[in-house]
């Protein structure tokens, strides 16, 4: 099997701040991808731990909500080490990290991992909207060849593994075996690709042309250009991971290309991310009283469709596990994606969501 693995960050971020992770291990014939959920706390560390534990396992270990509890102490150590380093650097926003630790905020990630049992068979393990996509003889023959615990439901509320055993995560992982052939191509992807290919397959597109574009990738620059192209075609803007696996008649795995793992710089300066969240929660130049009484903005809810969208999401999924800022981000991203707002309209929608959530508290 030949493997190529690529990462690309959200358009507004730096590569080092990407919260997706992948691992390819040629000895255990294992490949894993995890999507750190950005509304959680330091999710990239959690995604990295689960990917590494799975791919390096020689005893067939795979994640379940119970088994990932063994990784919780490791995540706690990484979290505390990061907090210590930020304080030593006199980061003015380091208190936000300590506050998050005191509030027992945790990390969450989706996961897809495969382990080759032979050149003709693999075992897969999936939780959330990260997916395994199988092209049979160069074609995506139906939505059924996109394997995810959501099976076509790619929204902003995926199943996940949680770093806090008291929360326990969400959803039931899928674990199964499947036959493959040397005429197949396997993709392990995070949700932007899951959603993109699902919509194409649902409309009857066999995606053969898209697969050819994928097979031509040989560098990070090639991949970034492809992601930008597909975003212009409707793929949503988020951290995007793509691992391409081409089976053959060999029982070994060779890595033809892989992007640098951001985990190599696991204690990079995240000041910009922390500051960004702080500024979104506390807009400059206005006190909370002024924001509540600001009549220069449009009405809090100016269409019943928007109000129904938020109410339905809250009634269906609850809010406790996400927290205030998490819900701001989830709802904003979901509604913007739904309505394809841009520019100043995006800022207005974010204000509307903030005000509406404040009124519901």
What are these regions (language model features)?
Residues 1-18, 86-99, 145-150:
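Short glycine- and acidic-rich boundary segments immediately preceding or forming the N-terminal edge
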Residues 1-59, 130, 166, 175-177, ...:
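N-terminal entry segment of metal-dependent catalytic domains or homologous docking segments
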Residues 15-25, 103-119, 123, 147-198:
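Acidic loop->beta-strand submotif enriched in PP2C/PPM serine/threonine phosphatases
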Residues 26-27, 116-120, 135-139, 247-248:
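Short acidic-glycine loop/turn motifs at beta-strand connectors
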Residues 31-35, 125-127, 187-189:
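Short hydrophobic beta-strand that contains or immediately precedes a catalytic carboxylate
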Residues 52-90, 201, 205-231:
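Helix-loop-helix
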Residues 64-135, 169-180, 234:
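Catalytic core of PPM/PP2C metal-dependent serine/threonine phosphatase domains
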Residues 163-316, 324-361:
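C-terminal catalytic subdomain
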């Amino acid at each position: 099997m030949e493997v190529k693995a690529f990462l690309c960050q959200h358009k507004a971020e730096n590569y080092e701040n990407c919260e997706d992770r992948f691992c390819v291990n040629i000895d255990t014939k294992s490949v894993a991808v995890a999507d750190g959920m950005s509304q959680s706390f330091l999710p990239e560390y959690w995604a990295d731990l689960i990917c590494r534990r799975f791919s390096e396992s020689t005893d067939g270990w795979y994640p379940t909500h119970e088994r990932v509890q063994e990784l919780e102490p490791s995540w706690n150590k990484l979290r505390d080490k990061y907090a210590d380093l930020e304080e030593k650097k006199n980061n003015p926003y380091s208190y936000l990290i300590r506050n998050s630790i005191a509030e027992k905020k945790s990390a969450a990630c989706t996961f897809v991992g495969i382990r080759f049992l032979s050149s003709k068979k693999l075992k897969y393990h999936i939780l959330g909207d990260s997916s395994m996509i199988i092209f049979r003889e160069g074609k995506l023959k139906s939505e059924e060849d996109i394997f995810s615990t959501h099976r076509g439901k790619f929204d902003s509320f995926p199943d996940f593994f949680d770093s806090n055993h008291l929360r326990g995560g969400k959803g039931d992982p899928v674990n199964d075996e499947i036959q493959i052939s040397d005429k197949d191509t396997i993709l392990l992807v995070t949700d932007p690709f899951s959603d993109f290919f699902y919509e194409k397959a649902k409309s009857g597109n066999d995606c053969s042309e898209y697969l050819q574009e994928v097979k031509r990738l040989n560098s990070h620059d090639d991949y970034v250009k492809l992601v930008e192209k597909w975003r212009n075609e409707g793929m949503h803007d988020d951290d995007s991971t793509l691992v391409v696996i081409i089976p053959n008649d060999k029982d070994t795995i060779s890595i033809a290309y892989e992007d640098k793992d951001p985990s190599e710089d696991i204690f990079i300066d995240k000041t910009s991310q922390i500051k960004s969240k702080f500024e979104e929660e506390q807009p400059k130049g206005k006190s909370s009283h002024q924001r509540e009484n600001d009549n220069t903005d449009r009405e809090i809810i100016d269409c019943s469709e928007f109000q129904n969208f938020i109410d339905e999401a809250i009634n269906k999924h609850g809010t406790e596990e996400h927290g205030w800022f998490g819900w701001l981000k989830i709802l904003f991203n979901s509604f913007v994606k739904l309505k394809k707002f841009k520019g100043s309209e995006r800022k207005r929608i974010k204000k509307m969501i903030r005000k509406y959530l404040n009124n519901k508290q």
